[in-house]
Amino acid sequence: MPTSIELSPEMMRAIIMDHYSSPRNKRQPEGEGFVSTHSASVNCIDNIDVFLKMGDDGKVAEAYWDGVACAISTASTDIVCDLLVGKTEAEALYLLEQFTHMLHGEEYDPEPLDEALAFQNTYRQPNRIHCATIGWDALGELLKEHHHD
């Protein structure tokens, strides 16, 4: 049984629709020092680029995304960009891991997930899991690549 924090269906919808209709992190980054990757879905319209910049302190300084995506992918990717800023690489990877556990209906730590808890019932709709994880997975790859640089 998944661990969860109680959010009403209305609250979950409101969080998702807020980030879909007014994404805060959807833009091309300005300045230097960003790494990026492209991710697309064969089953949905999702076709995005994600951008990550690590600070000198080893924490995520900035995270953005740009492109075309469905409501689930847009909201989820926008939320993860918010959540990653200020996290160390280890904290960020832990966050990504907990989100993945949650989406697959496994035990997870809800503490770091914040607004991403709006996706806690996604495991009941397996066809939407990829939409919810496309941005998270891409940012996770960038974090892992940064670690090996």
Task: Annotate each language-model stretch with its function.
Residues 44, 72, 124-128:
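Secondary-structure capping and boundary motifs in well-ordered enzyme cores
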Residues 1-26, 30, 36, 87-149:
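C-terminal binding/interaction regions
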Residues 76-88:
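Alpha-helical support elements that line or immediately flank enzyme active sites
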Residues 68-75:
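Short, thiol/selenol-centered motifs that function as redox-active sites or metal-ligating centers
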Residues 22-67:
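Structured beta-strand/loop patches that form or line metal/cofactor-binding pockets in enzymes
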